[in-house]
Amino acid sequence: MFKYALPLYPTMEISTESWSLTSLERINSFIEIGNQDEMIYINKDDSTKVFDEIKPMRHQILIGNMMSSRSPVDSLILMHGVGTGKTLTAILSIINNISDTEFGMKRALILTPNRAILSSFKEEVFNCCMHHYGAGFHTNVEHEVRNIINELFKFDTIRSFCNKIAIKSDEIIHKEWNASFIVIDEAHDVAPSGIDYPKLNRFMKILSTRKLLLMTATPMRNGSSDLIPLHNLMMKKQVHDISLEEFHGNYVEINRRRPPSEDGDSIVFSVETPKIAFMTKFAGLISYLPSDALRLDNVNVINVGDNTTYGGVLLSTTNIVSHNMSELMERIYSGLLNDNNNTNRRGDVALLDQRQASRFIFPDGQYGTLGYMAWMNSNTGKATLRFKRELRFGSNMETVLGAVEKFSPRYANIAKTVYECARRGEKSIVYDDLVTGSGLLVLATILEAIGMKRGSGSNRNSFVCMTREVMTVSQIVAAQRVFNSPENYDGSIISVILGSRVISEGLTFKDVQHEHVVAHWNDSETEQIIGRGIRVGSHSKLLETLNTPVTVKVYRHATIYNREPDKSVDVIMYATSEMKRKNINTITEALRSIAMTCPELESRSISRTICAFTPHEENISNVVPLHHPTIRRTFMDRLNETFNYEKDEYFVTRMENFCSAYNLNYQSDGGMRLMFILLKLIQTTPQLDINKFINCDGYFVYTTKTVDEYNSCRTLRYPFDVSYKSTKRLYYDTIVSLITEPNLIKAYETNPNYPLTKLPLHVITIILEKAISRKLLLTSDDEHQNAYHIQALDTFKQYYHIVYESGGGSNSNSATDIKAVCWLSASVAGESTKYRICVSDQNTWKDCPDDMKEQVNNIKVTKDNTTIFQMREKSLSHYGQKNPFSNDFCLRVIPQNSLSAKYDKRRIASGKKCTTWDNATLGRIKQNLGIESPLLHERTTMSRSDSCKLIESRLEEIDAVVTDVACGVQAKRK
């Protein structure tokens, strides 16, 4: 009921507060153990459909419940390994959240790095929604489900979305996107130095209410500083963002080292050690699940090749398939190393020339772009006629591969391997980040030379090039669908994928048994690529058909410069990657230790456990500090810059103002507990259509277009001390109780210490409309409405009328028929523009249009005449009116004639306040009611106030007092 009281701008986080491990355990044990097989808000019938068809795993259910509207977690880095089902985790989390129509988000916003991933995400959303929503339709199921998706889900690429919001004002962004469940897939692509990050960070700072899920298996590519943009996106105030300089100075300790090598030109790499400040800064922001925490039953992964050395140091975690350079390649490569004037030595820090030359040397000794332009058709990406002759097109495979050997031993080996695997019915993926030059398109030409066909086909000899140079996004998605189809489990339609960066993230390839990758500067890239073909459920069709375990082989290729192996660019890249991996593993272990949830790796279980780290400082032992928006000050920003809230006399005065407005006793634990519930509901519940919030005195005020004016509003802060007694523990216990006790809010709503009439009028109007809608849907067999709705319907029965009621004799046929009307706001404002109507279409409420105002006014007058007739039947001259907000009591003369629909609207419809009537009139009224003797000597002299109390009591006994919100309000009607 408090969800309409929300700020336009976000609140400031507390930076010195902490969750206790006990509180975290209560949250997680409730979500995990109490709901290990079902979502909180997806009802059992729906969840059964989802589970039967999609079979979400326990870690997916856990995250879905942690990101529900009931949970205080509003931002999370989903650091789950490749192949663990992050997409389904996100979709289930969204559906679980928005299924809570009371406090869930309004919509989902899905952002991905490119359109290929976006298309794949859309397909996953459709499949999941078909299972969840499809059963509710009998015809045009697909069309209806897509309509639901279009309403609830918005999709875009990161770059496109950032360009759109860059030209919009804060107010427009807040109105369009507040209360959204935002998912950013492959979030590590949001780089702090990129052009998208500032725009996206501004967008996140504007939203006062949102859930944010950052999905990435590899949040760090080069080091811990890659975490900075992810952290900042989760912060709701700019003041809590971390700069690169601050991060390196306060959060990690950096030491630079050089591995032992005879060559003084070896690589210098960094070793980062996280400090306690790092641990506390990221505590509670991470959900951690490595790929190997999920057992891939009957799928064995083999890394083909041997370990190599660099600078005399064994690369212990990297198996390499080595290819010795041919004589031609060595000659060209040696020239690159020895030519001191080569731009590669001066400016090509990525060693691109060496990488091109290590892949393929064209027949004339050129490589890269120059060789490609001379030997390939740059428009079609296919070989020229003279290149085909050099490759012996039309000859047998041995002849072709013999010709290829002198240009590229690596390509000859890959071509032979994938060809033989295809003939055996085993599918392959070949990945390279270089496409033109000496890259993938040259390899595609070699595959064509040995007899394989480009595009889908038959006889297990077809391949496709999934690159933007030769295929559109729609073609890539279509090819992926064919490759993953059950009919193609053995590669009978497409057996080989040649993929560039477009397939390196977010896509799934099924039933793959061979993966060929090239060297990268960081192991995260390689891990992402390998994960495209090794995922949960990715080999289900193959396992079902073969009924035997499946082996997936991973080939990490390297071309070796025989004269000086340590100067082979592939070896240098693998060595750099392994060094970065060792450094990143240290940071990953730190994140794992302070993750909100993580698996018990020892038992390979995916069940939840609290992974607490042991800090070195005694004063924060047994505590996981939490520096993120799930714990905030009150629902406003700050009291003001000069207000000293620590001084008890000022503090208590402000607390009294607030608590008085909400009928709370700030000196009792119960009153404070209810206040925390109020504040938590206000700050975490989606704002719908009303831009209003409550100021420190408990009154609703309108927001403004500028954040500066918003920040100038005086506000309260909490948790705080009351009478020198800390309420911090009470605060945390209350927040946890909101999660673990679902009926707690309803219990407080029906508590007599917090009556309905303490709410502002516009909130009561919304509650009344909701109660009427609920009553319209009820049948005699339905569970009765909740007590709060009953109170609203009974207290304000004079201000609404139900035209069509469930189970009644008449039915509403048209979607535009009026089912109910409400004029509560109009009775205060005195304007017909405040009339509200409920139409038949889904019991929706809206402002009354001009052409219906006369009809609604007739209904209102009829209701008033009914009241007058009932009072006239009691033989009364006056009847009572009671203002539920002020408790004022008024008397109104019963008119002799019925009211007309054309009566003077400028007249005040309510009676006069009882205490303003003269004693003589009050005496006559008391005589009429039989509470005063007509004999003068028997009358007692009493004050007007006492007379009014007697009259009010008597009229209540005979049911002659009605609710009137205008009673006692001296306002002119215009």
Curated annotation (Swiss-Prot):
One of its GO terms (molecular function) is ATP binding. It comes from the Viruses. SMART domains: DEXDc (SM00487). Keywords: ATP-binding, Helicase, Hydrolase, Nucleotide-binding. Residues 67-237 form the Helicase ATP-binding domain. It is an enzyme of class 3 (hydrolase). It catalyses: ATP + H2O = ADP + phosphate + H(+). A motif (DEAH box) lies at residues 185-188. InterPro entries: Helicase_ATP-bd (IPR014001), P-loop_NTPase (IPR027417), SNF2_N (IPR000330). Its EC number is 3.6.4.13. ATP binds at residues 80-87. Pfam families: SNF2-rel_dom. Residues 413-595 form the Helicase C-terminal domain. Gene3D superfamilies: P-loop containing nucleotide triphosphate hydrolases. Belongs to the DEAD box helicase family. DEAH subfamily. This is Putative ATP-dependent RNA helicase. It comes from Trichoplusia ni ascovirus 2c.
